[in-house]
Amino acid sequence: MNNLQVSMNHKKITIDNNIVIDFMEEFPNKLKEFFTLSGNSHVFDREITYLSEKANIIIVISHKIKIYIIFKDYIYLDNTILNSKIVRRFIKKYPILASSYELINPMKLEFKNSNIVWDCLSFTYDAKQAAITLLITTLN
C-alpha cells in the first residue's frame, strides 16, 4: 500500500510503518536501502499514498534536504490552489497549520509555523503538468 506519514513534531517520514527515515539521525543508509540514487536525488521506486492520493516521492540532499511529494492525478484548478482537495485534506490532517499559510500566488501556497520542525512546507500547482507538488524543506 505504501502509505506515507509526515511528522510535524519530528523531522521524519514513515512509509507503511516499517520504513522510517529520521532526518535528525543517520538517514543516508536508510535512503540507500529503500531509495534509488539518481544524481543527488533519492527516488522511492514504488508509488505511495498520501492524503488519500497516489504520489511519488523524491528526496534531494544538498545544503538543504528537500522532500518532493508529487501527486499523480491530473488536477485542474478553478481558482486557487487553496480550493484543491489535496490542500484541504492537508489542512484538516494538520490543524496546527490551518492559520499559518500564505497564498503567494494562485498556484503557490506556503506554510510557516514555529510549532513545527520543518523549515518550510509549500504546495505548488504546475498548470502544464496539471499536477500538485508538496515540497518539504529543512537544513541538512
Question: What feature does the model see in each segment?
Answer:
Residues 1-109, 113-117, 126-140:
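Short helix/turn-capping signatures at newly exposed starts of structured segments
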